[in-house]
Amino acid sequence: MIAKAKFAGADAVKFQSYRTDQLVHPEDIADFCRKSELSEDDHRILMAECEEQDIEFMSSAFDLESFYMLCELDVQTIKIPSGQLFNHVLLRAAAESGRTIYLSTGMSDWSDVVTSVELMRAHGMDMDKFVLMQCTSAYPCPPEAVNLRVLDTYSKVFKCRVGYSDHAESPAAAILSVAFGVSVIEHHFILGSVGLEKYDIAETPDEPVSLPPFPFKVMVDRIRQAEKSLGSGIKFVHEAEEPMLHRRDVQL
C-alpha cells in the first residue's frame, strides 16, 4: 500500500495510532478496532518501508500513550484527529512536543476551535509547525457540508497554515481547496475492494470516500495543475500570450 501511495503521488502516508482499551468501551466496536490496532513493532515496520519508498511516515494519535510512542519513534509529523479536539491533556502534550502538529476540527464549532488552538498556543505550540485542518466528519460528506470558506477564516484569525481533510465522494473539494491556500490535503486511500471481505462494509465507514491508486493519482495531478493555475496575483502579459500580441485590436 505504501508503494502504491508513492506511485499515486502522495507526499506522505498517515496511519492511525491508538490503544483500543483506552479508546472505546462497547465490546462490539472494540473487536473491530482491535483488528486494525498497530503495535509498536508494526509502526517500526511501516516506518522502515516508508523510508525505503522515500515517502514521509506520519500518524494520528488517538490517546496520550500512543502520542508518546510516536514521539519515542521520532515521528516528526503527528495528527490530532477530530475526536480528540477536546482532549486538552493530549493537546498540551502535542503543543509541548516540538513536533509538526495537524489539528483536525470535525464535529466542532467556532468556540471549540478557538479554545483548542489558544490552549496549544499557551503551551508553546510553534505556529510555524501547526496546521489547522478543516474537516466535516461525515462519510461521505455532502458538498453543502464541506465549508471550504472556513479555511480563509482559520488562516486570517490564527495566522497559521491550513489544511483540508476530505471525506467527500468527489475529489472536487480537494482540488478546489488549493484556491483557499491549503498546504495539506488529506484523502483516504485503498488498494481496492480486495482484502475488504474480512470486514463488514458497514463497519468500514471510510471505504465509500477512499480512492484506489489510479483515481488517487488523477486527483493529485489535478491538484498540482490547480496549484500552478493560481498564479502570482499580479496582472501581466504572460509569455504564453506573446504569439497573440500582434492580433490585439487597435482603435483610434
Give the residues covered by each predicted segment.
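Catalytic cores and adjacent flexible loops of soluble metabolic enzymes
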Residues: 1-252
